[in-house]
């Protein structure tokens, strides 16, 4: 009898939970329509993979690419709508969150064609790779709109778990396994630290978990200036710092960038660029280390975009009364990142490690925008620079992936004389590097100029001066690589470039298509900055 009553209660409770979930999905589902498109793409990809023994490779690439494009379209149609909070306060939609979601979708859309040839050459499992990329993208999008501590914790964990799996995707390589283990252990530790910081805020606010309700709770409990808030600020800054990878939370970045590699005997002739079944180009893959993988390109931009969106909301809302404290912490992180990242990048011999330390320096510039905040167009300048950084960084990685597939090396010295063999690739890489360094009239120059100007207007004079000096340092090591690219002296040209197969002037493989898009986006937008700045300013909440 007791068991029967308990069973009935369980059924009633389950029914209530199901009906509440159905009610939320029915009335609030339209607010996460872009995310629902990605979920549908994931399910469709799984169904096709499980129902067919013979994999239709063009369809496997077509489904996630179409899902991402449709999700971007849905976001654009929803632009300028009124901000809304849905799912009982767990999720918020506004222009500010949506522009970061757009940036994440843009990264993923460019990274999928970037990975086509690499996956074919290394003969990795295609479906699982695409599933991990889509799921990580979904986690990043939910993180951008997260409005409570539970969602802020679960969404990045979804992203992080897929990142761990992607970084260790080449599981037969020892270096890849070592990098993944470091990434996993440090990620788990940082998540624990982040949750501990959340617990301090939860207790101090009287048991609130929504961001705005935490502020109201701190006012009601008179705890907004208590030592507990300072402790929470330190722990949360450390936890978010791992995702942003500023110094001194950067140790995992160069190891993961360099550790993602693969060594395998590959057939000498492959049909590549079959993402939509259009192009067939003969390709030769060597038994060499093919590096860096598109995984690194994906992780280098999406994690920073998602973490930046989360950091701005967490610091600006719950820590509204502790602005001086988190400003000081972020200023220290920005200075350390800009100095250490750019100085250590000079000494690197691997392109991947150089880009890893360069990205640490770049996040220092982004932090300036977070510190400036909404008052002096700080967020607008951060969004603008993020957009340019995506194109500059992915364009650089596209060039390096292409060179790695053709030569099997990523040593900086092995790029010597590339211009004599492949002027198009050398020129594309040079433009992306110059834009990363911030040379006029490229997009990177105007992005940094706008960011530094907003910082100067906000009174961050020392931070801006450090940024200017470290930008000059970054130009040095970028120009050092460009000088190698353009050299014509035979004694400096390595066998990798001597044996380089000259590509046709008009090649139609997907890596070059992605590379062209990124190179154009790294150069032309610098000429017409006003529309981009206006859109970024319009996105502020």
Swiss-Prot record:
Q: Which GO terms describe its molecular function?
A: NADH dehydrogenase (ubiquinone) activity; quinone binding
Membrane topology, as annotated, equals: Multi-pass membrane protein
EC number annotated for this UniProt entry: 7.1.1.-
Q: Which Pfam families match?
A: Ndh2_N, Proton_antipo_M
Q: Which cysteines are joined by disulfide bonds?
A: none
The highest taxon in the source lineage is Eukaryota
| An example Gene Ontology CC term for this record | chloroplast thylakoid membrane
Which keywords does this chain's UniProt record carry? Chloroplast, Membrane, NAD, NADP, Plastid, Plastoquinone, Quinone, Thylakoid, Translocase, Transmembrane, Transmembrane helix, Transport
The record lists the catalysed reaction(s) as: a plastoquinone + NADH + (n+1) H(+)(in) = a plastoquinol + NAD(+) + n H(+)(out); a plastoquinone + NADPH + (n+1) H(+)(in) = a plastoquinol + NADP(+) + n H(+)(out)
Under the subunit heading, UniProt states: NDH is composed of at least 16 different subunits, 5 of which are encoded in the nucleus.
Q: Which family does it belong to?
A: Belongs to the complex I subunit 2 family.
> What does this protein's UniProt record list under function?
NDH shuttles electrons from NAD(P)H:plastoquinone, via FMN and iron-sulfur (Fe-S) centers, to quinones in the photosynthetic chain and possibly in a chloroplast respiratory chain. The immediate electron acceptor for the enzyme in this species is believed to be plastoquinone. Couples the redox reaction to proton translocation, and thus conserves the redox energy in a proton gradient.
- Name-wise, this protein is NAD(P)H-quinone oxidoreductase subunit 2 A, chloroplastic
Source organism (scientific name): Coffea arabica (Arabian coffee)
* The encoding gene: ndhB1
């Amino acid at each position: 009898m007791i068991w029967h009553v308990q069973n009935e209660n369980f059924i009633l409770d389950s029914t209530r939970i199901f009906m509440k979930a159905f009610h939320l999905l029915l009335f609030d589902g339209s607010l996460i329509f872009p995310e629902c498109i990605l979920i549908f793409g994931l399910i469709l990809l799984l169904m096709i993979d499980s129902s067919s023994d013979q994999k239709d490779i063009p369809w496997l690439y077509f489904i996630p690419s179409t899902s991402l494009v449709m999700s971007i379209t849905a976001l654009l149609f929803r632009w300028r709508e009124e901000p809304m909070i849905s799912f009982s306060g767990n999720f918020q939609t506004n222009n500010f969150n949506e522009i970061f979601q757009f940036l994440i979708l843009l990264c993923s859309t460019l990274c999928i064609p970037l990975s086509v040839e690499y996956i074919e050459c290394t003969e990795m499992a295609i479906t699982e790779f695409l599933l991990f990329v889509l799921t990580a993208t979904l986690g990043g999008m939910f993180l951008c709109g997260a409005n409570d501590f539970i969602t802020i914790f679960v969404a990045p964990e979804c992203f992080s778990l897929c990142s761990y799996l992607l970084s260790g995707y080449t599981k037969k390589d020892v270096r890849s396994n070592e990098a993944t283990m470091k990434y996993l252990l440090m990620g788990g530790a940082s998540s624990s630290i982040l949750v501990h910081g959340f617990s301090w805020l939860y207790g101090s606010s009287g048991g609130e978990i929504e961001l705005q309700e935490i502020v109201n709770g701190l006012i009601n409990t008179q705890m907004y200036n208590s030592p507990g808030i300072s402790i929470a600020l330190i722990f949360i800054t450390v936890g978010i710092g791992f995702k942003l990878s500023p110094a001194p939370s950067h140790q995992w970045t160069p190891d993961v960038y360099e550790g993602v590699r693969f060594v395998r005997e590959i057939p000498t002739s492959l049909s590549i660029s079959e993402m939509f079944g259009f192009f067939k180009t003969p390709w030769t893959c060597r038994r060499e280390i093919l590096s860096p993988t598109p995984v690194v390109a994906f992780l280098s931009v999406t994690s920073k975009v998602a973490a930046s969106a989360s950091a701005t909301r967490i610091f600006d809302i719950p820590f509204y009364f502790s602005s001086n404290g988190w400003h000081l912490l972020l200023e220290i992180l920005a200075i350390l990142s800009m100095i250490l990242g750019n100085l250590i990048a000079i000494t690197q011999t691997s392109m991947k490690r150089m880009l890893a330390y360069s990205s640490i320096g770049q996040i220092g510039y982004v932090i300036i925008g977070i510190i400036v905040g909404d008052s002096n167009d700080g967020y607008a300048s951060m969004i603008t620079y993020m957009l340019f950084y995506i194109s500059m960084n992915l364009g650089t990685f596209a060039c390096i992936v292409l060179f790695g597939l053709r030569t099997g090396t990523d040593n900086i010295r092995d790029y010597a004389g590339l211009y004599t063999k492949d002027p198009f690739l050398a020129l594309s890489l040079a433009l992306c590097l110059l834009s990363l360094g911030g040379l006029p009239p490229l997009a990177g120059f105007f992005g940094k100029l706008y960011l530094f100007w907003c910082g100067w207007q906000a009174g961050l004079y020392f931070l801006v001066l450090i940024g200017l000096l470290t930008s000059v340092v970054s130009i040095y090591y970028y120009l050092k690589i460009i000088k190698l690219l353009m050299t014509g002296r035979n004694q400096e040209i390595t066998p990798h470039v001597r044996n380089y197969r000259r590509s046709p002037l008009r090649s139609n493989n997907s890596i070059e298509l992605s590379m062209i898009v990124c190179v154009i986006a790294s150069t032309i937008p610098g000429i017409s900055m006003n529309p981009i700045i206006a859109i970024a300013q319009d996105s502020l909440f």
